[in-house]
Amino acid sequence: MWLLNDLFASTPVHSGERLSVVAMQQLGEIGARAKDLFERNRKLLNEFLDTREELEAVRPEFGTVMFPRVRSGDSEELCRVLREKYETSVVPGKFFEMPAHFRVGIAGETAVLEEGLERLGKALDEISRG
């Protein structure tokens, strides 16, 4: 009896190739969904930034990440509080030789970003209280 592994072991990317064909056939729909998602999430993050005086950011029109700066000068404490107390991850700016910044992505589902921004707000409030 043949196993799927016997059939696909010599070409392990077969399933990936099949999925890529399906995706290419629906590229317009996929692109439209992605554009809508990025625009909605970018607007959400920009609105959040408008309410947070302790952050500033260049607000690009395109892309899937933003790189806000913590005005106090160090994002390390913010990243630690987010990770330890709120189980939320952002990428510390130290990895980009910009320790006052942190990287946040907007390519995920909007509900996840909303929850993440709520947690980010709580962490910022906690840090500002001392």
What is the meaning of each model-derived region?
Residues 1-39, 48:
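Conserved core segment of the aminotransferase class I/II
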Residues 25, 71, 107-109:
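Residue-level recognition of strand-loop junctions within catalytic nucleotide-signaling folds
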